[in-house]
């Protein structure tokens, strides 16, 4: 039997951060990781650059958490984005802030974040154990450790930091949900979040595959609801199956059960122009070359890859001379550019999602300490909890803030 002050399942962002904080407080800590590699998911976040947080206030982080944001109030009050930045700079990682207040290592290399966390763990006496957690060890209603494939590990504090189900090749297999259920915790429905979407118009999207649009707006609507669910300016990407990119990923966090309702994504390709201003711009372009075919007249206005789609949607003969286009046809063109609508069929599989929506029901977790309300000595931190946010470093902030609250309570 091996005993520690704290034992943590999962060597991801939350698990290693919590281990460092406990080690700094003089606790003996073991981190159990079955994948044989620390921080595997961290290595691929931010396209391999690792968007560690967002350089904003705690209130702004709260606004970027679409569900259960109140649960995070205490944790964010105690460990805000500025604290995350100070932590990594203290470990020798230089940081920079980019567009949208996204914070990255100056090196643009996620490995530097992982190496810093691993070294901080080792320097504070944390032991990494290559083993697979099978079940919790419970005695008299209290968590006492983990029963693993190659042995049992006991501790005064037992911490589940196993992540969600996204990117399972990195070790995120959803084991934490099974552990939570074993002691009576409710686990809300697990679905993809921050995930590309498949559209019914995928054949229209395919020719534009690879096209990245900047400074467009995306509005997400649900059928039979007057008020939009989501509206934001940013970037998006056309794929062979539909839509992706930051705007689409953030909008996906608001998608519900697509068997019960239909969702639409409206893209405004020229949000800086009103309908009247766009019409004037088109008239000017048409006037410059009045004898051009319509299909050859939109190059100044739109990226070439999307022009065939716009022509098809607005229903204007592509070979029609622009000096013959009627006002009604021009209005259809303006409306199409200002509201290019796609119908969401489904999200891509959870394996392709950046994070998981759903998890351990936070109503059964103490928001000040992340301790289970059902089982003393048991804690849940990071993505295993039913809290998720938009892109921009907010999800890693959740991981670090929940881990800090846990360590602060134990330490």
Roles of regions detected by a PLM:
Residues 49-97:
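Glycine-rich active-site loop/strand segments that organize a redox cofactor
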Residues 7-9, 32, 133, 146, ...:
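Short hydrophobic core segments
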Residues 4-31, 406-410:
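N-terminal Rossmann-like FAD-binding beta1-loop-alpha1 element of flavoenzymes
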Residues 129-142:
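A conserved short coil-to-beta-strand element within the FAD-binding core of flavoproteins
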Residues 157-203:
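Glycine-rich loop(s) and the adjacent beta-strand/alpha-helix scaffold that form part
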């Amino acid at each position: 039997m091996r005993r520690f002050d704290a034992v943590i399942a999962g060597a991801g962002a939350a698990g290693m951060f919590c281990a460092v904080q406990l080690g700094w407080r003089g606790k003996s800590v073991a981190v159990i990781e079955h994948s044989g590699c620390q921080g595997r998911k961290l290595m691929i976040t931010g396209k391999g650059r690792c968007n560690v947080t967002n350089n904003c206030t705690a209130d702004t982080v709260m606004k970027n958490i679409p569900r259960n944001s109140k649960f995070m109030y205490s944790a964010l009050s105690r460990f805000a984005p500025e604290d995350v930045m100070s932590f990594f700079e203290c470990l020798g990682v230089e940081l920079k802030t980019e567009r949208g207040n996204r914070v990255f290592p100056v090196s643009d290399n996620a490995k530097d974040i992982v190496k810093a966390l691993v070294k901080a763990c080792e320097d504070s006496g944390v032991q990494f154990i290559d083993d697979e957690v099978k079940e919790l060890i419970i005695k008299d209603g209290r968590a006492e450790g983990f029963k693993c494939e190659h042995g049992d590990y006991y501790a005064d504090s037992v911490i589940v930091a196993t992540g969600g189900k996204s990117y399972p090749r990195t070790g995120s297999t959803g084991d934490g949900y099974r552990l939570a259920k074993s002691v009576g915790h409710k686990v809300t429905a697990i679905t993809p979040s921050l995930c590309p979407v498949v559209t019914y118009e995928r054949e229209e999207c395919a020719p534009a595959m690879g096209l990245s649009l900047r400074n467009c707006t995306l509005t997400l609507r649900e059928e039979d609801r007057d008020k939009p669910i989501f509206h934001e300016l940013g970037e998006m990407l056309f794929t062979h199956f539909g839509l992706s990119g930051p705007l689409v990923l953030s909008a996906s966090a608001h998608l519900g059960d697509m068997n019960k309702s239909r969702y639409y994504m409206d893209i405004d390709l020229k949000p800086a122009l009103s309908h009247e201003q766009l019409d004037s711009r088109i008239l000017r372009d048409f006037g410059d070359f009045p004898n051009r075919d319509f299909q050859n007249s939109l190059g100044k206005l739109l990226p070439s890859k999307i022009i065939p789609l716009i022509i098809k949607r607005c229903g204007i003969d592509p070979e029609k001379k622009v000096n013959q286009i009627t006002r009604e046809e021009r209005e259809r063109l303006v409306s199409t550019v200002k509201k290019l609508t796609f119908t969401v069929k489904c999200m891509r599989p959870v394996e392709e999602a950046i994070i998981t929506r759903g998890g351990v029901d936070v109503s059964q977790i103490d928001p000040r300490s992340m301790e289970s309300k059902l089982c003393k000595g048991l804690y849940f931190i990071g993505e295993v909890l039913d809290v998720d946010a938009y892109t921009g470093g907010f999800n890693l902030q959740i991981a670090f803030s929940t881990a800090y609250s846990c360590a602060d309570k134990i330490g």
